[in-house]
Amino acid sequence: MGRFIFLSSGLLVVFLSLSGTGADFQCPSEWSAYGQHCYRAFKYEKSWAEAEKFCMEQANDGHLVSIQSIKEANFVAKLVSGIIAYIWIGLRDRRKEQQCTSEWNDGSKVTYVNWREGESQMCQVLAIWSGFKNWVNTDCASHNPFVCKSPA
C-alpha cells in the first residue's frame, strides 16, 4: 500500500510539473511544437506572398515563421534539415516613406537577426549552405519551400 501511495504521489508531481510548460497543448497532426507555437515545414515551392497566404489558411493566426531567438532558429533548422533549398521565413522589407524597415509578418518585433554579412533586406530565406541558420535576401517572387508557425 505504501508503494502505491508513493507511486501515485510521484505521478502527480510529474503531471503538475508538466502543466504550463507547453506540454499541455497538442499541435495538429504533422505539426511540431516548440514553446507555445506549432510549426510545419512545407516542401511546396511558392512565392513569399503565396506561402504567407497558405500559412494563414492552414492554421488559425498562422504565418510564415518568425524567429525570435537562437534556440528557435536551431529548432527551425532541424525541422527543415531534409529540404534541399532555400526556405522562406516571415521577414521582409517594408518601406515607410524614405525609411526601410524589416518586420515580421505576424506583427512581432524583430528582436533577433541573423542576416548573412553584407545582405540588404528584401524577403528573407534560410540558406541551406549555413545549415538553415543564416538569412539571405532574395526576390519575393521566387519560389521556395517554407515554414508556417501558429499559436498553439
Curated annotation (Swiss-Prot):
**InterPro entries, alphabetically?**
C-type_lectin-like (IPR001304), C-type_lectin-like/link_sf (IPR016186), C-type_lectin/snaclec_domain (IPR050111), CTDL_fold (IPR016187)
Q: In which tissues is it expressed?
A: Expressed by the venom gland.
Keywords attached to this Swiss-Prot or TrEMBL record, sorted alphabetically, are: Disulfide bond, Hemostasis impairing toxin, Secreted, Signal, Toxin
Residue intervals of the C-type lectin domain:
34-149
Localized where? Secreted
Picking any one GO molecular function of the record gives:
toxin activity
Q: Which GO terms describe its cellular component?
A: extracellular region
Can you tell me where the transmembrane regions are?
none
The signal peptide, as residue positions, is 1-23
Pfam families under this entry? Lectin_C (PF00059)
What cystine pairs are annotated?
C27-C38, C55-C148, C123-C140
Q: How does it assemble?
A: Heterodimer; disulfide-linked.
Q: What does this protein do?
A: Interferes with one step of hemostasis (modulation of platelet aggregation, or coagulation cascade, for example).
Q: Which family does it belong to?
A: Belongs to the snaclec family.
What is noted besides the main data? Shows greater sequence similarity to the alpha than beta subunits compared to other heterodimer snaclecs.
Question: What protein am I looking at?
Answer: Snaclec 5
Q: Which organism is it from?
A: Bitis arietans
Top-level taxonomy: Eukaryota, Metazoa, Chordata, Craniata, Vertebrata
